[in-house]
């Protein structure tokens, strides 16, 4: 089961207050519902491919309105051929839709979110939970990028949902897609805050656990890469220095060098793998700082370069 599916399953098991039931149902029906007429009766169908969400809608309708609700199961004939669950409401459909503040003129759904429906903070949370159950998805935190989104068919509803979410400082944004609109967020911290707001606390803990391990692994990798780069740089510099010292030895001999340069030249050839700091601690005449060692090695590089170019050599 995907992380998104596990999150939705957790949300379908939450208990909700009476006022919050209306908010959650309103989002679920507005986003997944459709209306039709049969024998002059208004029929509401709420469709989903998630059995847990279908049970959730069925249970909330029965609990809130004590009406007869049908649950139909059909098989998709294309692509994955998943089951499609249809929660059908015939009894008092118009009255219930009006109570949920989503039935507009000419029997079409309102595209805005009723302020009366989400007046309380707990109801705002429940509406967001219903919207996520109806059209939401969230990437597995182990994947390369963090992403949570909720899909809406209509721009007005998408904008209203984004505004509602940002009342909780989630920094969500909107984007037009080919067949609708999405409200989304890409910051890991904001995704965990969203999961907390809608009540998916177990999923939040799992997300955070994976994120911490992932961030730690990335930090270790960056540190290793940095250390490797520094090591390669040190080795490269050491090889260049040894090559220059050997060239000087071939051309004029190390004995021609001043004592301070000769001492460092011999140490570098004998201990090619050590750092400048370690090299400075090996000097018999007394410990020399890293910058002091670096200065003398640069002087040796300069002498080698002068010899290669046939220039007069400055030994002091």
UniProtKB/Swiss-Prot annotation:
GO molecular function: DNA binding
Any one GO BP annotation for this protein: cell division
Domain of life: Bacteria
Key words, A-Z: Cell cycle, Cell division, DNA-binding
DNA-binding region listed in the record: 275-309
UniProt KW Cell membrane keyword: no
InterPro entries: Homing_endonucl, Sporu_reg_WhiA_N_dom, Sporulation_regulator_WhiA, Sporulation_regulator_WhiA_C, WhiA_LAGLIDADG_dom
Biological role stated in the UniProt entry: Involved in cell division and chromosome segregation.
Entry-linked NCBIfam families: DNA_bind_WhiA
HAMAP family: HTH_type_WhiA
Family assignment from sequence similarity: Belongs to the WhiA family.
Name this polypeptide is given: Probable cell division protein WhiA
Organism: Bacillus pumilus (strain SAFR-032)
Lineage, opening ranks: Bacteria, Bacillati, Bacillota, Bacilli, Bacillales
């Amino acid at each position: 089961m995907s992380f998104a599916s596990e999150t939705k399953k957790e949300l379908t098991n939450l208990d909700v207050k009476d006022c919050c039931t209306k908010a959650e149902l309103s989002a679920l029906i507005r986003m997944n519902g459709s209306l039709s007429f049969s024998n002059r009766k208004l029929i509401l169908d709420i469709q989903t491919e998630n059995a847990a969400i279908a049970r959730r809608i069925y249970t909330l309708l029965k609990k809130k309105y004590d009406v007869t609700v049908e649950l139909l199961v059909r098989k998709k004939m294309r692509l994955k051929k998943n089951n499609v669950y249809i929660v059908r409401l015939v009894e008092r459909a118009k009255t219930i839709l009006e109570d949920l503040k989503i039935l507009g003129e000419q029997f079409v759904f309102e595209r805005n979110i009723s302020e009366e429906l989400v007046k309380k903070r707990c109801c705002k949370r429940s509406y967001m939970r219903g919207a996520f159950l109806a059209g939401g998805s969230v990437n597995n935190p182990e994947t390369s990028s963090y992403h949570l989104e909720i899909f809406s068919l209509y721009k007005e509803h998408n904008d209203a949902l984004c505004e509602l979410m940002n009342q909780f400082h989630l920094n969500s944004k909107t984007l037009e897609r080919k067949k609708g609109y999405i409200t989304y967020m890409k910051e890991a911290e904001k995704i965990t805050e969203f999961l907390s707001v809608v009540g998916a606390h177990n999923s939040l803990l799992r997300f955070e656990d994976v994120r911490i391990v992932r961030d730690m692994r990335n930090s270790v990798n960056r540190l290793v890469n940095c250390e490797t780069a520094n090591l390669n740089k040190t080795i490269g510099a050491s090889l260049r220095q040894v090559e220059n010292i050997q060239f000087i030895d071939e051309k004029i001999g190390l004995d021609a060098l001043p004592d301070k340069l000769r001492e460092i030249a011999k140490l570098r050839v004998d201990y090619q793998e050590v750092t400048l700091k370690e090299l400075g601690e090996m000097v018999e005449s007394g410990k020399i700082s890293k910058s002091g060692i670096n200065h003398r090695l640069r002087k040796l590089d300069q002498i080698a370069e002068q010899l290669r170019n046939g220039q007069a050599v400055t030994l002091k």
